[in-house]
């Protein structure tokens, strides 16, 4: 990245540390930037921290300009663009937001399911906690995401499972009354009460999980 930007690797690293020093999660870890971190860095942080979609769109476009890459429809189909597009048309903005969200969420969880720890990337989805269609401001926010395998993504999306305030899996009552197959028992019944694996960054937003429990979970 430093070579592309015309900066030394150490200069790029320190700039990123400056931004990290504004992040409450990193401040708890005592991450500190330069003592003279400029007001410009703070202004950029404040602007984009409250607008994940804007940050995503501008940063992804900037990266493509720097790297000279162009996304094709074929390339995008190879990626699992999990959320449904509600605008009726796949605009460039939507594609970039979806791509950023998926990569940010999955990388935060080390490319493994936060429930069962399956680590086959082809079997993973970046699941929105508050559904894509319900809150535009949350669409690109990685804290509104969980890395889930295909089974648990589907169950979470349909309200068959959720997480409590302590990040433990809760299974809907209906799931417990259905005829039990081996997969049903291992994949759903036995995960109840299990604490999900939390990421080092972009920890799931507590208010988003509360929304899921109240509005999505089947109870």
Task: For each feature predicted by the language model, list its residue ranges.
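DNA-recognition alpha helix
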Residues: 1-6
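Major-groove recognition helix of helix-turn-helix-like DNA-binding domains
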Residues: 7-23
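C-type cytochrome heme c attachment motif
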Residues: 8, 111-115, 151
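Short Lys/Arg-enriched helix C-cap and helix-to-coil transition segments
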Residues: 24-46
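Charged, alpha-helical interface segments at or near domain boundaries
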Residues: 44-93
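Short, charged surface segments at domain edges that flank catalytic/cofactor-binding sites
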Residues: 75-118, 130-143
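A detector for short metal-coordination/catalytic motifs
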Residues: 100, 118-121, 130-219
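The −1 position to Zn-ligating cysteines in a subset of zinc-ribbon hairpins
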Residues: 112, 125, 148
